[in-house]
């Protein structure tokens, strides 16, 4: 493998991981802005709509450790791509949800994908970067998460 190819691959991996982690993190809080609108659109109360947020966060919290194990067993790339696909599918279902229960279920699907993305991201970066550059790459990913 040539040095140029290796350099290109590691930066592509960092960009992919940063995008996936950013989307998963952003989705955990951005829905809060829309809660009053969701309450109005679905003609329901805040007690029902709050589960849109809780379902996503609870799913990630429950699945992030098992997702890490799945990544170790099935391979980083395959699991990361599956995480992106599941997250995207969940996002599509969220956009098409006709009711709050279906929206909550769609957020659970999103949470499964997000858990795969979040658990696998640091492992992908650790594998892609040499030891002397690893800290900077992980720091860059941390900056993206906190942005």
Predicted regions, residues:
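Transmembrane-helix bundle of Major Facilitator Superfamily
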Residues: 3-147
């Amino acid at each position: 493998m040539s040095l140029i190819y290796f350099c290109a691959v590691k930066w592509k991996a960092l960009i992919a991981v940063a995008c996936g982690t950013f989307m998963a993190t952003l989705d955990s809080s951005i829905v809060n802005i829309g809660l009053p609108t969701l309450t109005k659109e679905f003609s329901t109360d805040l007690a029902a709509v709050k589960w849109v947020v809780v379902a996503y966060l609870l799913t990630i919290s429950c699945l992030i450790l098992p997702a890490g194990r799945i990544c170790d067993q099935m391979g980083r790339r395959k699991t990361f791509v599956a995480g992106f696909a599941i997250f995207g599918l969940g996002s599509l279902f969220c956009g098409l949800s006709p009711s709050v229960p279906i929206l909550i279920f769609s957020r659970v699907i999103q949470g499964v994908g997000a858990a795969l993305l979040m658990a696998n991201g640091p492992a992908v970066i650790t594998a892609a970067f040499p030891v002397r550059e690893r800290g900077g790459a992980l720091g860059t990913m941390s900056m993206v998460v906190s942005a």
